[in-house]
């Protein structure tokens, strides 16, 4: 999908024998994160389009770090990311789904915007049975 849209895709990950959440939530989490990254890259008219996914574990912490190139300004209200689509009432559900999963598993989510870089970092605490 990224290749079809002229987006360079990089991935660095570890193997986890068991994720701390359900398979459907894992698909929803990564699906929404990648959909948002691809959509942001598609808006870039000039410049490099890229997405980088990193998954790493340090002791009992699991880090999901997804970064991508951007062109448009990121909208933030009350510390939350806001959709920049015209029909706001029917958009933003992907972000809400991500937040729901992060909150359900008592994770933390932060983001950074620096120039043409957007990065979202999600951290989960792993119990003794996970990974």
Model-predicted regions and their roles:
Residues 103-116:
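Glycine-rich ATP-binding loops of the HATPase_c
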Residues 72, 114-121:
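Glycine-rich nucleotide-binding loop
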